[in-house]
Amino acid sequence: MSLLDKIFAGRKPPQDDLQQRSRDAPAAVDADGTEIYEEDIVSHIMQELERRRNERAVLELQWTLNANFLAGHQNCDINIASRRIDDEQYVTKADNERRVYNRIAPLMETRHANLKSVNYDMVVEPRSAEMDDYAKAKVSTKLLAYCQGDTDFQAKTDKLISWAELTGTAFTLSFWDPNKGDLIANEGAVCDEQGEIVQPEKPIRTGGLDFGLVSSYEVFPASLCVQEIRDQHDIIIEQVRDVGEIYDLYGIKLQGHMMETYVLTPMENAMTGHGRNNIAIGMSKEQVEDVEKVVTYLENPSRDYPKGRLVIVIRDAIVYYGDLPAGEMPIVAVKSKPVAGQFFGKSPIQDLIPLQRTYNRIVNKIQDYVDTIAANPLIAPEGSIANLDELDATGIEPGTILIYRNVGDRPSFLQYPDLPSTVLSERDHIASDMEYVAGVSQLMVVGATPSGVTSGTAIDNLRQIDNTRMSLTADNIRDAVIAMARIWLRLNKEYSSGYRTMQIAGSDDAGYVYTWCADDINSYDIRYTAENELRHSKDQQRQDFVQALQLGAFTDDNGQLSKSAKQRARELFMGDSAVGDAFTLDELQRKNAARENAFLDQGVVPERYRYDDDAIHLEEHKKYALSMDYRLLRKAMPQYAAAFDAHIDAHEQALAQKQNAMMQQMLAAQGGAAQNG
């Protein structure tokens, strides 16, 4: 019995679906009504793919070199003639060091850590001043928050930053996944004439939005000199995917092949001195098994194709031909450093590589100097050492007895001059230049200030300069996320049918269920709820808060600090996680009142609780009553608004009764004091 028979227990192994297809019928009709055959479409796409691959080859080599230097495989360079990365094999003495002292990795890790701190909470602006548009903008804002949580946005953004920093550009591809969402029904299994199941039972779901990451290695634009995706005629994406993943995505069973793809793999780092070959991790092409190429052709909308074109080709066969999702290019580019007039961005590693080579050479020369001194070289008259061959092979080890002839001066250690300070200064200068090129400083990398900088103001200025330079990349990422969010809204509007529900967590630690439909999406004007943190960092916010506090901006007429200012101070100086532990009773009352406001939007009318602080609840409820959300609620659900007004009246009556009771107690106390007097 074969291995396949054991796996499938006597059942037929999966057939290759593409081999059973007929390709005689036309695949599509162009704008003039001419029939287009599958063979012609596939041939055109594949020819374009190879042309673009040749044009992009040098850039691909640069990305691979970037990956090698980041991983520590640095004794290599680009061979333009052979179009590959070759190890540097120049001849040196056996004892000369050629080690790698990787400074690129910690610098890039510092950049990554700072870029991860950026916030991506978004809000959709209403299309007009109409009440309905405000309500729809609120639904769209909640929908974006839901999509971020449902698509594992944070983890994917982390990988997105890594790829953008490595190659200069990373891409996101948003799509509608019919296998996500709530279960509607199950499609029955399909059997052949013999009763064997040819298509198992399949669940039918409402569908949901998702997005994936695409590396620069997989993207082939129509022109390398057209900077924006919207200005490209089309883009081709070539991916090597596992056949199981292809079946999950497209429902097509394939027998996989062995293909080449880029992977990080252990590789020799050339001769490093003393006859040793070190192993380092580097980027290279390796063979992977049971995979197949998936080629995706995306054409921007044009006069002939107003909704664009999307063609998916697997093994020279079209598995999908149609319009772009929602008639818009679903791919977004995230660039670390945009280059004017170029489609692909630039990685900081590319500018760091020449400095890293120089740094390695300088430190290796210093190490050669140290090794030479540590070898204890001798100077002796000719013929004075009897066991010269043995001594030359082993050197002077601890405890060695040196036998020499008294034929002149006795052997002595060779005196070397001190290492010139210029060498050490140059090493430090190169290290400083690398920090400058990477957009960071010693303050950001190791927390140490440059020599001679002791002033607090100067240190704050250095920190602000670092954040400002890093914020350029952060702004590029934030702009790309905004563009992706617009695509999300359009995909939801295009593919959502009927009324749908989404569960999200609110800012007051409560979960909410929102009901919406595609008609609720009518605005694509999106902005962030907060400024780029790298432009206005947490430290800068603390400093601004202290300055405003000193000016009396947070004190009332009696000179007392307001409760909201105290809460803001806890958030800035103690962190968000410590705020909940530091809540006073008044702050808990305020949080409870805000939760009642939010529940009202879900149809839950609040009731006055015996432990409610009426004054605090009145303040929070009246704030909500003056907001646009309450105006929308009053229009949509007037009965709930009336109940909420009655709830406010109940608090006012209870507060008035308490105040009257306190007044009576004060008058009674004053009257008793007068009688005693």
Q: Which residues make up each language-model segment?
A:
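Extended, charged amphipathic alpha-helical segments
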Residues: 279-452, 456
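Extended, helix-rich architectural segments
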Residues: 1-316, 374, 390, 422, ...
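Charged, low-complexity interaction regions
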Residues: 554-560, 604-611, 629-636
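Conserved structured core elements
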Residues: 134, 138, 154, 166, ...
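Generic, well-ordered alpha-helical scaffold segments in large soluble proteins
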Residues: 143-150, 352-376, 426-441, 473-498, ...
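Long, highly charged low-complexity segments enriched in Glu/Asp and Lys/Arg with interspersed Ser/Thr
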Residues: 562-594, 628-670
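Short amphipathic alpha-helical heptad-repeat segments
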Residues: 610-622
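Extended amphipathic alpha-helical segments with heptad-repeat/coiled-coil character used for oligomerization
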Residues: 178, 455-593
